[in-house]
């Protein structure tokens, strides 16, 4: 019988020991184990740069790559695409009830939960944990200097999190 499923999106954490990456997901595996023990299918995916997926998450402030924005690149967009592809994979699994797929995550994973729920109607419920701010805090208060680029979505319309929440509705966003 197909089971309800959770797409678990990793936040940020220390991932390399002695130069070897064990993936960011090792810090969150106990969450997936709890979900499995309680009757859910759970897929945990790594974050860009902070696990097994090579790339740069902190490009704008750490590497002064603000030009990325003008070129249409954002690590939030890359994370959203990774989530979409994870949902594509989950749809191929017979143990997954595709009508009951939720998403959650902490920190950066909380931010990705907002993105994927707004972008993909296959998410039936989203439960982001932390990982959000607003445009003023991100830019004016310089929150960007202490967080990675994925925590806020860059967009020409100056949309903020309330607008993203509207895109999730009427599905639950807790």
Sequence positions of predicted segments:
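Short beta-strand-to-loop junctions in surface cap/lid or active-site-entrance loops
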Residues: 1-2
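Cap/lid segment of the alpha/beta-hydrolase catalytic domain
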Residues: 5-92, 132-142, 150
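Alpha-helical segments flanking ligand/cofactor-binding loops in enzyme cores
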Residues: 33, 114-115, 166
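Gly/Ala-rich phosphate-binding loop of Rossmann-like dinucleotide-binding domains
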Residues: 36, 117-118
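Alpha/beta-hydrolase fold nucleophile elbow
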Residues: 95-107
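Glycine-rich nucleophile elbow surrounding the catalytic serine of serine-hydrolase chemistry
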Residues: 105-117
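Conserved hydrolase catalytic core segment
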Residues: 118-124
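Mobile cap/lid helix-loop segments that gate and shape the active-site cleft of serine hydrolases
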Residues: 124-166, 170-171
């Amino acid at each position: 019988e197909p089971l309800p499923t959770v797409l678990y999106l990793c936040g940020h954490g220390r991932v390399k020991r002695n130069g070897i990456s064990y993936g960011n997901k090792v810090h969150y595996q106990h969450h997936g184990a709890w979900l499995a023990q309680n009757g859910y299918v759970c897929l945990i995916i790594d974050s860009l740069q902070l696990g097994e997926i090579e790339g740069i998450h902190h490009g704008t402030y750490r590497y002064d790559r603000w030009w990325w924005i003008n070129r249409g690149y954002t690590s939030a967009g890359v994370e959203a695409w990774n989530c979409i592809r994870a949902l594509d994979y989950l749809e191929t699994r017979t143990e997954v009830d595709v009508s009951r797929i939720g998403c959650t995550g902490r920190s950066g994973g909380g931010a990705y939960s907002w993105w994927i729920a707004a972008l993909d109607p296959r998410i039936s419920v989203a439960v982001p944990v932390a990982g959000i701010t607003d445009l003023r805090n991100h830019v004016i208060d310089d929150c960007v200097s202490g967080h990675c680029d994925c925590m806020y979505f860059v967009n020409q319309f100056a949309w903020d999190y309330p607008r993203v929440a509207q895109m999730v509705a009427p599905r639950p966003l807790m």
